[in-house]
Amino acid sequence: TIEVEESPVLAKITIDGNKKIRDKKIKEVLSYRVGMRIKPNFINSSMNKIRKLYKEEGFFLVEINAITTPIDRKNTQRNNITFTINEGKKMKIKDIIIDGSGKNNFGWLATKKWIPMPRLLRETMTQYKLRRQLKDTKIRTWWRFWASPFDKKKFTDDLDALSNFYKDEGHRDFTILSDSVYYSKKKKGLIVRINILEGSKYKFRNFSWEGNSLYGENVLQSALNLNKGDIFSQTGFDKAVFQDVQSLYMDRGYLYSNIEPFFTPAGKDSMDVHFSITENNKVYVRNIN
């Protein structure tokens, strides 16, 4: 005969040693209920979830232990679990590495190709310019001793800021391939590594329009105020289309008009933009209360 021993039932979970993150927030990530069977992988899975939560708050040296104890000697099938946490200190950022930024230079001096300087110096200036786009993710140095510890949410916002910077510099196809955060060799700080794909730096080649009956192409192009040969900027393009051109229709009562741009690459560094306009019906005001 084969005897199968049932997994014990969970009676209670206790969190001990936590000062920076409240019990409620920790228990929310554990996804448990009192009375459930304690499966063999539940404890390890729970410890990993707690560890992930702490790392997102900047506590990369957190240590977690778990102890399972029966509620009493007679009832060994109802167990309490205690997670003991040694939070450690929040870790500062020792270095930020942006891989994949070698094709293009950024920063006023680095972009002046007529100024003779070593390639390494240009790359260093570019890295400095790119790091400056990360508003809240900063390397701690002796002159920036106030730099905050790593914060996952702020880092996510900073990645968006880096993407916006590239797209405003003409790199419409810019992509962040991956990002990672890990200890330095002696665990004295964190290394933030961002792998990127810059893509081509685009300029406008041609503009074309369809669906426009209220305005001729010359009027629309004048309102757009973008010229052939201009470097693409996502912020500038969005303003030109969805504010400047769109306002022509809004001012005449076409509140539901729609402008949709389509991009077609032309060669390595140029693109054509075709605008499809759906003017829809004019909106009239019936009553004003």
Where do the language-model regions lie?
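Interaction-mediating elements
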Residues: 1-289
